[in-house]
């Protein structure tokens, strides 16, 4: 507020600066990243926006804008909460026919051994293509685990590829695998 934006070609949407996928505003040579551009208000999103913006300004080739549905959301509490992509509701609203898998940490050997078996992992897939639409987690170290699904989404990995991925044992990440298997009625340990 009151920084002179009204004298520029910068556009606002509900108080946030409108940018293209590279941080450029409507005013030539003026860029914006981070919280001023709107949700999600996450440090890792802002940091990545800064990198993309600088790469674009520097004229680098193959700069990829952020896809909002691929930004991981993490809440650092106990139990931890993490997510990426669409929720079941949003996927249905977008017209997807979905498959959903869930796996509780109380059935994961590593979580039991750690004495931290509260929570679960849920995965949401496009029933037609097998695309991973979203993943949601509550439990031990899920703010670390979510990156596996972020990478899977960014590489456009399907459920078949995730089902055939070998997850080390005993690890918390095995719950990720079991959640994928559960979406296709193939869970092993629950």
Regions found by a protein language model. Name each.
Residues 40-47, 53-90:
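Rossmann-like dinucleotide-binding cores of NAD(P)H-dependent redox enzymes
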Residues 24-25, 29, 67-68, 113-115, ...:
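Solvent-exposed alpha-helices and their adjacent loops that cap or buttress functional pockets
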Residues 11-13, 60-70, 96-101:
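A short alpha-helix-loop-beta-strand transition element characteristic
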Residues 58, 77-190:
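Flexible, glycine-rich terminal cap/loop adjacent to redox cofactors
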Residues 29, 71-72, 133:
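Short amphipathic alpha-helical segments
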Residues 1-61:
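FAD-site-proximal beta/loop scaffold in flavoenzymes
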Residues 22-25, 63, 141, 154:
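A generic short alpha-helical patch detector that favors 3-5-residue windows
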């Amino acid at each position: 507020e009151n920084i002179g934006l009204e004298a520029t070609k910068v556009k606002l949407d509900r108080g946030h600066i409108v940018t293209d996928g590279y941080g450029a505003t409507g005013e030539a040579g003026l860029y914006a990243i981070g919280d001023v551009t709107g949700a999600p208000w996450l440090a890792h999103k802002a940091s990545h926006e800064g990198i993309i913006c600088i790469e674009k300004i520097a004229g680098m080739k193959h700069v990829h804008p952020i896809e909002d549905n691929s930004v991981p959301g993490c809440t650092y509490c106990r139990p931890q909460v993490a997510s990426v992509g669409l929720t079941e509701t949003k996927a249905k609203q977008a017209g997807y026919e979905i498959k959903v898998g869930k796996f509780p940490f109380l059935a994961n050997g590593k979580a039991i051994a750690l004495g931290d078996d509260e929570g679960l992992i849920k995965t949401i897939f496009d029933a037609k293509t097998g695309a991973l639409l979203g993943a949601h987690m509550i439990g031990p170290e899920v703010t670390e685990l979510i990156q596996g699904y972020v990478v899977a989404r960014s590489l456009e990995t399907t459920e078949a590829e995730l089902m055939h991925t070998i997850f080390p044992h005993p690890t918390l990440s095995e719950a990720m695998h079991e959640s994928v298997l559960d979406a296709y009625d193939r869970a092993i340990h629950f």
